[in-house]
Amino acid sequence: MSYQGKKSIPHITSDRLLIKGGRIINDDQSLYADVYLEDGLIKQIGENLIVPGGVKTIEANGRMVIPGGIDVNTYLQKPSQGMTAADDFFQGTRAALVGGTTMIIDHVVPEPGSSLLTSFEKWHEAADTKSCCDYSLHVDITSWYDGVREELEVLVQDKGVNSFQVYMAYKDVYQMSDSQLYEAFTFLKGLGAVILVHAENGDLIAQEQKRILEMGITGPEGHALSRPEELEAEAVFRAITIAGRINCPVYITKVMSKSAADIIALARKKGPLVFGEPIAASLGTDGTHYWSKNWAKAAAFVTSPPLSPDPTTPDYLTSLLACGDLQVTGSGHCPYSTAQKAVGKDNFTLIPEGVNGIEERMTVVWDKAVATGKMDENQFVAVTSTNAAKIFNLYPRKGRIAVGSDADVVIWDPDKLKTITAKSHKSAVEYNIFEGMECHGSPLVVISQGKIVFEDGNINVNKGMGRFIPRKAFPEHLYQRVKIRNKVFGLQGVSRGMYDGPVYEVPATPKYATPAPSAKSSPSKHQPPPIRNLHQSNFSLSGAQIDDNNPRRTGHRIVAPPGGRSNITSLG
């Protein structure tokens, strides 16, 4: 039974707002102008605007006015081993708004073999009744079963879902084979969907986990040791290769290592439509914490793919983000409490995976990229909002300050200092992986659907005020190029006459012959090796020989063989 939408849950009442004296920052331009908001939309942009009386005025005083952030990688209320992630849709979206994010795309994670449609309705209802900001939903394909194609069609055509995640890891749980990935990519391309990939080599991870546990390593460091970055990079390369054969766009989630990022950057230079998403954690911290003597601290960083133990990785990923080789920043927000993480205290494979970042994402990106001079303000807007809106077909409704766009607006103070700490964050967990980090850049005012939801450090939201935002298939930012490439690079056979020559008759035998028994499998039937020591054999060249009485001819040197000399290159 499908969820019919929330009942008697009041949406926020839009205010008439005038933002004066701000500097509008979009991904492609900046300008000084006032912005008038009404009925949840941006109505006017310019100077000396004529607005109705009684309008609330916000003085920006030259500060940046940017589109609200879009976090396309969250796992609120995700189930794991009978537990649920600590932040539900209320707590998670509340934290998002405080950090300047005004829309999320959350992952629906069905139990393997269960209905995608049923799971979607379950997530939709939970988000609709609790979310404080606008949201949409990815649907993860956790198994490739009979009937999945029909459900995917319904989700795309009737439910407003245009993005699906597949897994190359989690052997015997979520993992798909290469042939299944090929089938899924082909089918999803036909639907005009965005294909998200969790890229890790699940087969090798399973072997490494077994080996490391047998060595007696059970702590969080085992998580990183069993998932070296080569296994992420190999899977990224494989996913891009499969997508390239089909000519479909592919979006790599949670880029955590230099190797994986390099493969994405190189592939983009060669032409495949691939997009890479580092998360706040991989940009703001590293995997050296897995070796902390404090088990709870080490476990807090457990996520997959793991954070790189190389402390230079965050700076490297930030540089690739700044130059466009990586395009979007997510958070991968899926925190579990310390008590929940402790389920794996004696076995690192049982530690629930996930870190925080939904509140910290935009501040971390500003501090690591813009405040260091790697990235300008326009690029900041692109990687935190606009690129995501374009890829997932939300643009220009989201991701832009323009007349007609949704009134999701942030007044950003680039000079504001903020120390990240679990004592003041809005997440329900008692730790923060960015604990003690002092960052430049933070929102002063956050406006969602035309109403002020965060101002002067105070959050003012209600459960259920967020809206589900449906997304249409075939986002132009991706599929415009796909359509052209289908025409230009389509496969064509060679026009030739029919072959009418002889055809060898192949005997009707089984395709695969039974292999001969080996020494290991049938030692009793195997003959002893021949004797190579001539002293132990009855073979001799001394004494009388059987042909001693035959007449012998004098040897002659053959100048040319019978029939004359041959030419090895001649067939005549």
UniProtKB/Swiss-Prot annotation:
Phosphorylation at Ser-522 enhances CRMP1-mediated alteration of FLNA ternary structure and FLNA dissociation from F-actin. Gene3D superfamilies: Metal-dependent hydrolases, Urease, subunit C, domain 1. The modification Phosphotyrosine is found at residue 504. Transmembrane segments: none annotated. One of its GO terms (molecular function) is identical protein binding. It comes from the Eukaryota. The keyword Cytoplasm applies. A motif (Required for interaction with FLNA) lies at residues 246-247. The keyword Cytoplasm applies. InterPro entries: Amidohydro-rel, Hydantoinase/dihydroPyrase, Metal-dep_hydrolase_composite, Metal_Hydrolase, Metallo-dep_Hydrolases_sf. GO terms for cellular component: actin cytoskeleton; centrosome; cytosol; dendrite; growth cone; midbody; perikaryon; postsynapse. Residues 513-572 are annotated as: Disordered. It is found in: Cytoplasm; Cytoplasm, Cytoskeleton, Microtubule organizing center, Centrosome; Cytoplasm, Cytoskeleton, Spindle; Cell projection, Growth cone. Its main location: cytoplasm. The modification 3'-nitrotyrosine is found at residue 316. Keywords: Cell projection, Cytoplasm, Cytoskeleton, Nitration, Phosphoprotein. Residues 513-525 have a biased composition (Low complexity). Brain. Belongs to the metallo-dependent hydrolases superfamily. Hydantoinase/dihydropyrimidinase family. Homotetramer, and heterotetramer with DPYSL2, DPYSL3, DPYSL4 or DPYSL5. Interacts with PLXNA1. Interacts with FLNA (via calponin-homology (CH) domain 1 and filamin repeat 24); the interaction alters FLNA ternary structure and thus promotes FLNA dissociation from F-actin. Necessary for signaling by class 3 semaphorins and subsequent remodeling of the cytoskeleton. Plays a role in axon guidance. During the axon guidance process, acts downstream of SEMA3A to promote FLNA dissociation from F-actin which results in the rearrangement of the actin cytoskeleton and the collapse of the growth cone. Involved in invasive growth and cell migration. May participate in cytokinesis. This is Dihydropyrimidinase-related protein 1. It comes from Homo sapiens. The gene is CRMP1.
